[in-house]
Amino acid sequence: MKRGEVRWAEHPDWPRRPALVLTRNEAIDHLNEVFVVLATTNVRGLPTEVELGTEDGMPRACVLNADHVASLPKGYLGDLIVTLGSERLAEVCRALDRATGC
């Protein structure tokens, strides 16, 4: 598991959905949980959304919603869907900045 990977999240309380791993690579092996941004097909056009599509390697169009982040146990993250490049990760970081104001 690495930063930038989009994996299937299998949380018992949520429908199965893609989740982008944002935890830094140096920490992943030492942690039980990782920080993720969850994807949804419910596109609202918010400045905190990053659109992804089949051209990005996703199975269908969706958005990564920086207003919907979570710390998930690594065991909840399953198969790899795609690894995002640095430009896409930068878009997600800008969306997180807008979402949190940090």
Q: Predicted segments — roles?
A:
Residues 15-54:
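Compact nucleic-acid interaction/catalytic patches
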